[in-house]
Amino acid sequence: MQLNPAEISELIKSRIEGLAASSDIRNQGTVVSVTDGIVRVHGLSDVMQGEMLEFPAAADGQPSFGLALNLERDSVGAVILGEYEHISEGDTVKCTGRILEVPVGPELIGRVVNALGQPIDGKGPINAKMTDVIEKVAPGVIARQSVDQPLQTGLKSIDSMVPIGRGQRELIIGDRQTGKTAVAIDAIINQKGQGVTCIYVAIGQKASSIKNVVRALEQAGAMEYTIVVAASASESAAMQYVSAYSGCTMGEYFRDRGEDALIVYDDLSKQAVAYRQVSLLLRRPPGREAFPGDVFYLHSRLLERAARVNADYVEAFTKGEVKGKTGSLTALPVIETQAGDVSAFVPTNVISITDGQIFLETSLFNAGIRPAINAGISVSRVGGAAQTKLIKGLSGGIRTDLAQYRELAAFAQFASDLDEATRKQLDRGARVTELLKQPQYSPLSTALMGATLFTVNKGFLDDVDVKKVLAFEAGLHQYLKTSHGALLDRLQQNRAFDKEGKDEAELTQAITAFKKSFV
């Protein structure tokens, strides 16, 4: 059989065209040293800051990943996310070309996940349809809208004196064992039926404490709208550092789609300590209190992502799918102080970043005033605009009464005979202080809170014994629920008294009637 030259050339051409000679270009390097979860890698010339690096798989076949944090002249300093015992000198490290991402979306609601969004509650896999990067730029000034919608915590002392609005950052600060977590959990429980998705980020806490929080949320039915991100004390410093950003990204998913979300960081002191540990192991120069120079930026870039975004931003983000809706992410960061020292490095940083703070005091807590809020130095810089008309109108006198009471109580210790006006002021203050006490996991509705504040404002409690004030309040709430349900429904819906004064008259009548029967 003889082939002519044209056929031969056609055959060669077709063979060449069918040849798959593709090559996969990947940037890779070699492990130089491994110490305390910090890996030095030689090579990786094109690596990005914060890029995920792929390390050899562990014995169970799960791939190991790290985060490139230090980009030096001849090596890269990376921190391992998870176990690092199986990594040794000479191992190959590959660039992934991706920044660290976590799963986001409604599939995460009701689940407990780790800092990487992997389930740790034993309820099976999370089939999230989307992932998103943990480090994002916060919305700009043009994309934002002013805070004017309330985020009710259900706590009398907070909603009346330091109100929180949707999209605000309100710091909860105090010594250990002063009820900081309790305030945050009550705020989450009170969002039931309010259309707010909650994210609770536990950083550096004991696993048993996190378990107790999850149990409390389950019992209150709050896990139906809550995601728990847990980086316990037993996990690496890198996981504790990353967890806050992971939780924030999960919250931003809802914010950017015109929904409301609430995120609690419990607590950022431990996150700062974890970041300090990572930074010192990476040989970064230490500054004040041995924290690295960018510890302010650590918290500012996180908390600036909590915002209320306008309808244009939401419409542009969703490509026109969601119109005319604003979204919000409200942040409640927690900071633990040492012996009440709010002028330490991390507390002052976070105070300057947030829109106000709720200061909890050990002395008040030990005196049985719980929540132990110090009304004098607790402020809300933007929440006043978001307060409901009902609570705003009734709470004006509360802070003044308390402030005057604290001042007079200090002098009254030394005075033997007090004039009538001073005694009245002291009596009113004692009753207000007693009335602001509230048991844990029992947030109040706006209507019942309004009724309570109305009672003290109009002087109905002036002749009730201080020890019976809380019993009076509980009895009044029960009486209003059974006999004046329609009034409570109106107040809850309108969040204000009617202009004709009928609601006010009915409430006065109801309290007077109840008081006659109260023994």
Curated annotation (Swiss-Prot):
It is found in: Cell inner membrane. It is a peripheral membrane protein. One of its GO terms (molecular function) is ADP binding. SUPFAM superfamilies: C-terminal domain of alpha and beta subunits of F1 ATP synthase, N-terminal domain of alpha and beta subunits of F1 ATP synthase, P-loop containing nucleoside triphosphate hydrolases. Keywords: ATP synthesis, ATP-binding, Cell inner membrane, Cell membrane, CF(1), Hydrogen ion transport, Ion transport, Membrane, Nucleotide-binding, Translocase, Transport. PROSITE patterns: ATPASE_ALPHA_BETA. Its EC number is 7.1.2.2. GO terms for cellular component: plasma membrane; proton-transporting ATP synthase complex. It comes from the Bacteria. It catalyses: ATP + H2O + 4 H(+)(in) = ADP + phosphate + 5 H(+)(out). Its main location: membrane. The record marks 378 as: Required for activity. ATP binds at residues 174-181. Belongs to the ATPase alpha/beta chains family. Produces ATP from ADP in the presence of a proton gradient across the membrane. The alpha chain is a regulatory subunit. F-type ATPases have 2 components, CF(1) - the catalytic core - and CF(0) - the membrane proton channel. CF(1) has five subunits: alpha(3), beta(3), gamma(1), delta(1), epsilon(1). CF(0) has three main subunits: a(1), b(2) and c(9-12). The alpha and beta chains form an alternating ring which encloses part of the gamma chain. CF(1) is attached to CF(0) by a central stalk formed by the gamma and epsilon chains, while a peripheral stalk is formed by the delta and b chains. This is ATP synthase subunit alpha.
